[in-house]
Structures are given as structure tokens and as C-alpha cells.
Design a protein with these regions (language model features):
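PLP-dependent aminotransferase class I/II
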Residues: 23-196
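Conserved RNP beta-strands of RNA recognition motif
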Residues: 17-22
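Short glycine-enriched loop/turn motifs at secondary-structure junctions
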Residues: 11-15, 103-105
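Conserved active-site segment immediately N-terminal to the catalytic lysine
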Residues: 1-13, 41-46
């Protein structure tokens, strides 16, 4: 069982929404109920559900996007490889790594600034943004620290995430990023590591 988001910034989009795939009949039946107001048959609601039905237009967009996905991921991976090579020599920054057991899709290219880096994450983002580099801070907190989940008392279960999350920022590697853009990004980040 897996879930996929088709939000506008994802590797593949239908504008909004997502998809659940499963080989478990029970999960499939529950997902179908939840997506259509909990309706088991016409006007018979057996659980509280939602309106998660995808429109035919969104599905058609998704089918076209799906044919392009492999090429888009390949381009993201190529861009990430160039960016990683350019950032590897910059002291105090840790680009994302790809283990030999995985294939990264680079939906996001997240860089970690080490505590000794001369600028904070927010200063990095602000400076790069001023220089025209599409940069943003990564997520502000682990999911369990969000208001909706805080009272479930799951605190402290991800100490490494809590330690590094305030030092993570994202750089662009989407398919529209070209070689000159990557060069500009690396040069701008390199200047941050050598403040005047």
C-alpha cells in the first residue's frame, strides 16, 4: 500500500489531490468509502467520509503527466548530481546523499547547514532569494509537533529531526532548471560560505 500526492509542486501533478494504491482488498474498500462521503451505495453512508473524488479532467491531466514522469525524474536527478558536485567542496554544507540501496526522485533537494556555517538557515534563504535563487526553508517542525498532533504526546521520538530541521533549506532542481541556473546557484551558495 502506498500513497502519492499530486499537489502542484510534486514531481507529477494533477493540480491537487492524490492516489492510493494497494493490493489489500480491505484497505481498498475503506479508501473507496472515505473518498466518497462514506457512501457504500446510493444515499447509504456507513461511515463519515469526505469528497476526495478526482475529476475526469484531473485524471486526464494525470495520465498525460504520467507519460512524462520518467523524463522529469531523470532531469531532476541530473540536476541534483551537478548541484551536489558543486556543493561538495563547500565547508559546512551537507548536500543530500543517495545510498546504493535507493533511487532518489529529488522532489526536494534539501541541504543541511552545519552549526559552524557562517549564516543561519534563514539568512541563507534570505540572501539566496535576494540574489534570485529560488530557495526556501525546509519544513519548520516534525509532523508530530504540528498543532493537530501535539496533544498525542509523541514528543521526542525523532531527536535527530528536531536537532537538524532548523538548519535545512531547499534548492531548485526541477526540470526547468538549466546548466546556467545550476552554475549560478553553486556560485551564490559558495559566496555565502566566504563572507566578506
Amino acid at each position: 500500500t502506498a500513497c502519492f500526492s499530486f499537489y502542484a509542486t510534486k514531481n507529477m501533478t494533477t493540480g491537487e489531490g492524490g492516489m492510493v494504491v494497494t493490493d489489500d482488498d480491505e484497505i481498498a474498500a475503506k479508501a473507496r468509502l472515505l473518498r466518497s462521503h462514506g457512501e457504500a451505495s446510493k444515499y447509504e453512508h456507513v461511515i463519515v467520509g469526505y469528497n476526495f473524488r478526482m475529476t475526469e479532467m484531473a485524471a486526464a491531466i494525470g495520465l498525460v503527466q504520467l507519460k512524462k514522469l520518467e523524463g522529469w525524474v531523470r532531469k531532476r536527478r541530473e540536476n541534483a548530481k551537478v548541484l551536489t558536485k558543486g556543493l561538495e567542496g563547500i565547508e559546512g554544507l551537507v548536500p543530500p546523499a543517495e545510498g546504493n540501496w535507493m533511487v532518489h526522485s529529488y522532489y526536494q533537494y534539501i541541504v543541511r547547514a552545519e552549526p559552524g556555517f557562517p549564516l543561519s538557515r534563514d539568512e541563507i534563504v534570505s540572501t539566496l532569494t535576494e540574489e534570485g535563487v529560488g530557495c526556501r526553508p525546509s519544513y519548520p517542525a516534525p509532523l508530530y509537533k504540528q498543532k493537530a498532533l501535539r496533544d498525542l504526546k509523541v514528543r521526542g521520538k525523532c531527536p535527530v529531526a528536531e536537532q537538524v530541521i532548523g538548519r535545512l533549506f531547499e534548492l531548485p532542481v526541477h526540470p526547468a532548471v538549466g546548466p546556467k541556473d545550476l552554475e549560478t546557484i553553486v556560485e551564490a551558495v559558495d559566496r555565502l560560505a566566504k563572507p566578506s
